[in-house]
């Protein structure tokens, strides 16, 4: 989580010392990570691999990190990543290098000779996205690591409200083996309207609509499929009513003008965190996304980082 104090999240967190939240910002693929964090001390090796294709970043333009004590060497940020560089200098940013979806350490010869196990459907963008979100790279995982984590912490919450919430649809990241995820609309939609099921804005219409919907859910309960669908709908109604009762709390907006897609998502997440006591939440996981970033053969032409 980067710069959360600017999003109003710090004030939201401060309500309870026993509250923990994980906010996952998922970048939807295509970014050239090798041109984001660049080895400064071993620049020659980097340049040897990158200069022939014309995508090496000049060493003189890198935003230097200083020597990183844990590895005893220096790196550089891409010259336009000034915001991340500032956070690094303030001690608010950590970089996890050399992570990915490999099943095991793989060499070029091992890949060519098929002696290394490689991710399922390697080079498929959609499969790689799923593998990042499931943390399973050698098979089609049925659940995401966010959802599986939610399975483990749900009992800490004193509510039926889901522990995992997405502002970017229903990605597999949010799917658990036990817990069902919640997907809500983003800001500037009011939080108390982020789950409205019926489209009627005024409370009298909403209330009457729900009375009739509840009656419909009692029909055809002898059929397993209908019974299951009715249970899910009934739970959704309960969650919408719980969220509606919280109102629309005020939080500091994301500091961009005009509004950004990511800022709108983070603002709604900040609102959710701020009403956690009303919802009975102690542990929550949030998912939002940005991108994608595929440049294909235009990376050299574009010249800017992703």
Model feature map: region roles:
Residues 1-306:
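Feature for exported/extracytoplasmic and membrane-associated proteins, marking the mature portion
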């Amino acid at each position: 989580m980067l710069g959360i104090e600017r999003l109003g999240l710090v004030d939201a967190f401060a309500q309870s010392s026993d509250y923990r939240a994980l906010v996952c910002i998922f970048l939807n693929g295509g970014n050239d990570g090798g041109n984001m964090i660049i080895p400064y001390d071993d620049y020659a090796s980097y340049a040897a691999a990158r200069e022939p294709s014309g995508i090496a970043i000049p060493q003189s333009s890198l935003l230097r990190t200083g020597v990183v004590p844990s590895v005893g060497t220096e790196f550089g940020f891409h010259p336009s990543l000034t915001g991340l560089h500032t956070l690094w200098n303030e001690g608010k940013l950590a970089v996890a290098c050399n992570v990915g979806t490999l099943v095991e350490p793989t060499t070029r010869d091992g890949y060519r000779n098929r002696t290394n196990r490689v991710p399922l459907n390697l080079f498929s963008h959609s499969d790689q996205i799923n593998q990042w979100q499931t943390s399973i790279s050698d098979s089609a995982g049925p659940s995401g690591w966010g959802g599986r984590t939610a399975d483990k912490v749900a009992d800490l919450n004193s509510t039926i409200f889901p522990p995992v919430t997405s502002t970017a649809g229903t990605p597999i990241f949010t799917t658990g083996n036990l817990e069902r995820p919640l997907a809500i609309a983003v800001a500037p939609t009011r939080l108390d309207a982020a789950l409205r099921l019926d489209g009627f804005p005024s409370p009298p219409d909403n209330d009457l609509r729900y009375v009739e919907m509840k009656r419909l859910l009692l029909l055809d309960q002898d059929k397993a499929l209908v019974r299951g669908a009715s249970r899910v709908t009934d739970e959704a109604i309960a969650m919408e009513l719980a969220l509606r009762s919280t109102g629309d709390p005020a939080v500091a907006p994301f500091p961009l003008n005009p509004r950004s897609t990511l800022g709108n998502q983070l603002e709604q997440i900040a609102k959710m965190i701020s009403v956690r006591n009303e919802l009975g939440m102690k542990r929550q996981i949030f998912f939002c996304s940005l991108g994608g970033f595929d440049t294909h053969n235009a990376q050299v032409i574009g010249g800017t980082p992703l």
